[in-house]
Every structure is written in structure tokens, then in C-alpha cells.
């Protein structure tokens, strides 16, 4: 809810296909941080961001998600590092947007804690895509 308001204030839009009845088991704070930190980055670094949150697949063991934005993406050599603590792709721009460089590291550890994996890739049409899985039953 707070992300929708923040997105609206920043001129960004968020769409999703997450069913209202979907239950994700786990640590609420960590689960929230996964979605919040990825979406917050898009709002901070993409002018008039279009952000899409999709449940792309599910099976008895896992839920699979994709979060995309319409920004410029990141340099290919930076993709391998964006989940590292304190890593910033563009230090000058990052300083203006604020933050500590911990958001995506927190995301990665929260996904792992919930039995999943996460990757980030540049989309052919521009922007970033985060693909991640979460175990249906986590610790």
C-alpha cells in the first residue's frame, strides 16, 4: 500500500497479477523487504517508472516471481555485483537518491532465507528484470 502511494507521488505506476488469495508463508518483514526494496529502487532510479510485479509460475514447492521496470538497466559488468553489500552501480546518482547500498543485498538474503534464488538481468527492451523463487513453506 505505501509503495503505491510513493509510486504515485513519483509519477510511477505499479501493475501486478498477484492473486488476492495467494498466501506466502514466511517472515513477514523479510518478505516485505524483497518486494519493497526492488520496487523502491525502480522508483528512485527510473524517471516515470513502469513497474510490473508478476507471479510467473507456481508448483507444489515454489512460487516464481518477476519484477520488471522500464529504466536503462545496468552495465553488464555490474549485474554480477548488484546483490553485494554496499555496491552501487552509479555512485553519483546513488548519493542523490539516498540509500546505503544494502537494499539488494537484503533482498538476496531474504530470498535465500525463504528457500529461493534470485537473479537480475537487463531486459532487451530496456530496464531490469529480477527473477526469484520463494519456497511455499519456509523456515
Where are these regions (language model features)?
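Short helix-loop "hinge" at the ATP-lid/N-box region of the Bergerat-fold HATPase_c
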Residues: 42-43
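Conserved catalytic submotifs in the C-terminal HATPase_c
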Residues: 8, 13-23, 58
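Short conserved segment of the HATPase_c
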Residues: 74-88
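Short beta-strand/loop element within the Bergerat-fold HATPase_c
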Residues: 50-61
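Acidic ATP/Mg2+-coordinating residue in the GHKL
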Residues: 69
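Conserved glycine-rich
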Residues: 49, 115-116
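Short alpha-helical Gxxx[C/S/T] motif in the catalytic ATP-binding
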Residues: 103, 107
Amino acid at each position: 500500500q505505501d509503495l503505491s502511494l510513493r509510486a504515485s507521488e513519483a509519477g510511477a505506476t505499479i501493475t501486478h497479477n498477484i492473486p488476492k488469495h495467494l498466501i506466502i508463508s514466511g517472515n513477514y518483514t523479510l518478505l516485505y523487504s524483497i518486494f519493497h526494496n526492488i520496487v523502491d529502487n525502480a522508483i528512485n532510479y527510473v524517471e516515470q517508472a513502469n513497474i510490473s510485479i508478476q507471479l510467473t509460475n507456481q508448483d507444489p514447492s515454489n512460487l516464481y516471481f518477476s519484477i520488471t521496470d522500464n529504466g536503462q538497466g545496468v552495465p553488464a559488468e555490474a549485474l554480477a555485483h548488484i546483490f553485494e553489500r554496499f555496491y552501487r552501480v552509479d555512485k553519483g546518482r546513488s548519493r542523490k537518491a539516498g540509500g546505503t547500498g544494502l537494499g539488494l543485498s537484503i533482498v538476496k538474503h531474504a530470498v535465500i532465507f525463504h528457500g529461493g534464488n534470485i537473479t537480475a538481468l537487463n531486459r532487451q527492451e530496456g530496464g531490469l528484470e529480477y527473477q526469484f523463487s520463494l519456497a511455499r513453506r519456509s523456515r
